[in-house]
């Protein structure tokens, strides 16, 4: 087994500004299911959630080594809260990292500091870690 790790840090207010400036931002970054979870958030939680998902998808792209755009699309990556509120990552389409055995994700918000930090760990079967 081998592991691929991606880490990202984003400014919550920068993500907020992008979402407010570009009407298509939510549709380009979030799946329909993620948008439904976002709609239930109020106040600071709304943009913290959005920044967390954006940052997590950036971290996933870094872990794969492809980056967003070439082989990884934002909406092929979905991060939904489970019944306990923990984020769970799933991937489809051309963003699927072949030979991935599992995905782990961590999202940390520091609203007073205007930051979200994320980490994605991909457990890969040995032998071929490329897609």
Curated annotation (Swiss-Prot):
Q: Name one GO cellular component term.
A: cytoplasm
User: What's the protein called, per UniProt?
Assistant: Holo-[acyl-carrier-protein] synthase
Cofactors required: Mg(2+)
Q: Which SUPFAM superfamilies match?
A: 4'-phosphopantetheinyl transferase
Q: Which HAMAP family match?
A: AcpS
What the record says about family reads: Belongs to the P-Pant transferase superfamily. AcpS family.
Q: Where in the cell is it found?
A: Cytoplasm
Q: What does this protein do?
A: Transfers the 4'-phosphopantetheine moiety from coenzyme A to a Ser of acyl-carrier-protein.
| Chain's gene name | acpS
Pfam families, per database record? ACPS
Gene Ontology terms: biological process: fatty acid biosynthetic process
